[in-house]
Amino acid sequence: MKKAIDVQAAVAIASLEAIAAKTQGTFGVGGVMLDSFGSVLQAVHNNVIRNGLVYDPTAHGERQLIDWYYAQSAKGRALPPPHEITIVTSLDPCCMCAGAILAGGFNVVVAANDRQAGVNHEGDGSFTALPEGLREQARATFAYPAVLGSSSYARTAIGATPPPFFIGKTIAEPTQALCSLVFEATAESVTGLFDADPPREQLRDPGTLPPEHPIVRALKRTCPDALTYRCTPQRPDAGLAPYLQHAARRDRAQGGPGDAVVLLDAFGNLLLRCHGQRSQSAIRTAFMECTRAYAQLRYKLMEGATPAQQDEVRQYLGHPRDGTFVFAQGPGDDAAGFMNLGAYGSTMEGPLPAHNPAQFQYVLPALDEARLAELCADMPPLYRQRIGTRPMQVRDAALVAALRA
């Protein structure tokens, strides 16, 4: 089994994964998972984009490594506990990945800084982007090793001390520069792929399609309840309650807290109803399942299709920013809640449209409105400025009462 017994060697592996990601046409980020002896357990790169299409907005390196860890454990593979595992990433974790790392209890060693979306975007190890209750854990487990040199890529060590199995605890300046430049070379072009969908006025109602249409059949395979509920756009009502309640029961059966999320389209049609898979992975929340399922539904319909067929898919299954995610439970200030907020940002990847300011809705609050607004305002610039993440409670009192009962 390959080993990386100094930080530089581990970051070099992550940088090679980042180069592979760039070659694939996705965000140039990579990561590697090590045990407490420095043995390489797994190495992956970002997989948000495949074949020029959005494949999975949650497929960042760190998130993939964590789900891989839990999947291997579920298969019976003997792996060390998370606190003995170290994830080495070529780029500062985003909010989704930081939440996933903290939820699992892993250690992390970070190469390049990310001033826009990184959890340490301020660069001082204060982690003010995190909810206050998570900051101390981050300071104890997130390491930003020294980069020796005189260029803008040099830095002093910040955060936790890298795990003791690392003999060398610094990053070479050229490797740090490579990690930064590979990401910078891909960020704009990849983000642009999230804007390939038509505007709201060009969308078509999938509820008008015949049952045998390939889009309807694919929807029904993914979610048998698709197109069986409809409300005024952006105004979920009490009719949605049974769908959320059913998903919440299934979530509890899977070891979750009663998590449930539905995706409504721009016309108010129910497209997906999802629960978490926490018995399989500590980070497979209902929202992570929902946003991934929708992206992969669209990807499978568009992969290998003609441009005209791809356009049809995008017209009937628009970008989520034109629809509404409805959570049974609002975001909390725990690691999973922060991960969900981050994953929402990774799904949007751009500003919410002016016609749909209430894209992110929840039925029952986990935090009071002021505290939730404060949590969102503390997030890195991508989330609070560019995307404008702002969850809000549904307006329908009967829906709230039904889920509270």
Model feature map: region roles:
Residues 1-21, 104-256, 265-405:
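Zinc-dependent deaminase
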Residues 42-45, 273-275:
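Short hydrophobic alpha-helix segments
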